[in-house]
């Protein structure tokens, strides 16, 4: 049974803030995940997911007027953070399938498009993994651990990205007197791109137009033709609201990227290749420390795959400081050590599907990064030719090295 949360998650907050939560209940779809150990094997967890706050309806308290406009916050309702919090309420989402999220047991399918009222609507859902309490995010501490999942990328054409990554978001989603909704309603997103997240930052009105920076570990950015993984360290811990030029110097937005195609393995990943994207793939990422303990310094990030019962190694042995030495600002901003510090503090799993209207995803699958043509990533082309675009993630698990997969 899915988790239905309206006021339940907020009982510990002062009553004065209850007016900021609307009357429509939030109905989190359950997504079973697994915590694994060498001794006990994998144990199921009753976790769930929540859509980002920007997918929720936030409106004037006692009225139907939205607190946002096409250009951002409505200045008459949100001239500042405090007034905005007093004027606006957030409503829950009861039907996640209408936002492109369909869960069943330990599997979740994210859909890019949906026909609504006879028209194809672009959805681009992004969801975060909640802990078993349904109130806070699952923050995974992965030093000297591995993170594994199964993925079906067969319905992701050129120009699409079905992503699973880690973000150093606050476990509560920044829950506070001005943001009583918190993680329960998907607040607090941040990443190493430091982009302006829109009207809300850490659940509060983003009246300054700040960017939301934090460390990011891209476990999987991929479609059926190309794949990358990349750590993105930052000089700060947790979410940092940046403004102006500092938004370009706090985090390594480019990251240390591993792309097998770009490194010359052109027959490694794709339909019918060594990693056959026509079939589901098990993806394993291992975070190895220098002393093989959960408190050690991150020394390597290893990647391997399992398909048809066979363990398939990565085309490079591991991602190390030596491998990343030429990656723009990666070393300057702390490299693997800084990334490891975030993994030690804990990071939140993020799942998404999206297209790229600005760059057409060339950085992932074209212009030397993959085999796709220069125009195949045009969102209009994708919508016209691949209306069933989707990605399915399943059997998400994490734990001791070697405990999450078998051959």
From Swiss-Prot:
It catalyses: Endohydrolysis of (1->4)-beta-D-glucosidic linkages in cellulose, lichenin and cereal beta-D-glucans. Its EC number is 3.2.1.4. InterPro entries: ConA-like_dom_sf, Glyco_hydro_7, Glyco_hydro_7_sf. One of its GO terms (biological process) is cellulose catabolic process. Residues 1-18 form the signal peptide. PANTHER family: 1,4-BETA-D-GLUCAN CELLOBIOHYDROLASE B (PTHR33753), ENDO-BETA-1,4-GLUCANASE CELB (PTHR33753:SF1). Belongs to the glycosyl hydrolase 7 (cellulase C) family. This is Probable endo-beta-1,4-glucanase celB. It comes from Neosartorya fischeri (strain ATCC 1020 / DSM 3700 / CBS 544.65 / FGSC A1164 / JCM 1740 / NRRL 181 / WB 181).
């Amino acid at each position: 049974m899915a988790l239905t949360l309206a006021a339940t998650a907020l009982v510990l907050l002062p009553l004065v803030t209850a007016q900021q939560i609307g009357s429509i209940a939030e109905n989190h779809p359950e997504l079973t995940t697994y915590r694994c150990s060498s001794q006990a094997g994998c144990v199921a967890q009753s976790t769930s997911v929540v859509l980002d706050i920007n997918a929720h309806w936030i409106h004037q308290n006692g009225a139907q007027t939205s607190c946002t406009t096409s250009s951002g916050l409505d200045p008459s309702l949100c001239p500042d953070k405090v007034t905005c919090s007093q004027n606006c309420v957030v409503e829950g989402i009861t039907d996640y399938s209408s936002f492109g999220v369909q869960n069943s047991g330990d599997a979740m399918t994210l859909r890019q498009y949906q026909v609504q009222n006879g028209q194809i609507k672009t959805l681009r859902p992004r969801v975060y993994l909640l802990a078993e309490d349904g109130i806070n995010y699952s923050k995974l501490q992965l030093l000297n651990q591995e993170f594994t999942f199964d993925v079906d990328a067969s319905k992701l054409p050129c120009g699409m990205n079905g992503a699973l990554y880690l973000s150093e978001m606050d476990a509560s989603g920044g829950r506070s007197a001005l943001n009583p909704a918190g993680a329960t309603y998907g607040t607090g997103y941040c990443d190493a791109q430091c982009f302006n997240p829109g009207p809300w930052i850490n659940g509060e009105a983003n009246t300054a137009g700040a960017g939301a920076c934090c460390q990011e570990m891209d476990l999987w950015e991929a479609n059926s033709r190309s794949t990358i993984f990349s750590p993105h360290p930052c000089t700060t811990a947790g979410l940092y609201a940046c403004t102006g030029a500092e938004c370009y110097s706090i985090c390594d937005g480019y990251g240390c990227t591993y792309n097998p195609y770009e490194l010359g393995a052109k027959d490694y990943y794709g339909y019918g290749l060594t990693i056959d994207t026509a079939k589901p793939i098990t993806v394993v990422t291992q975070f190895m420390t220098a002393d093989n303990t959960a408190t050690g310094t991150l020394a390597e990030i290893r990647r391997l795959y399992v398909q048809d019962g066979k363990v398939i190694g990565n085309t490079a042995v591991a991602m190390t400081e030596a491998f990343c030495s030429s990656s723009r600002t990666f070393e300057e901003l702390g490299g693997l050590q800084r990334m490891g510090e975030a993994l030690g503090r804990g990071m939140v799993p993020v799942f998404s599907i999206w297209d790229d209207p600005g760059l057409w995803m060339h950085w992932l699958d074209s212009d030397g990064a993959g085999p796709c043509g220069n125009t195949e990533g045009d969102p209009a082309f994708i919508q016209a030719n691949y209306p069933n675009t989707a990605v399915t993630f399943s059997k998400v698990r994490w734990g001791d090295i070697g405990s999450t997969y078998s051959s």
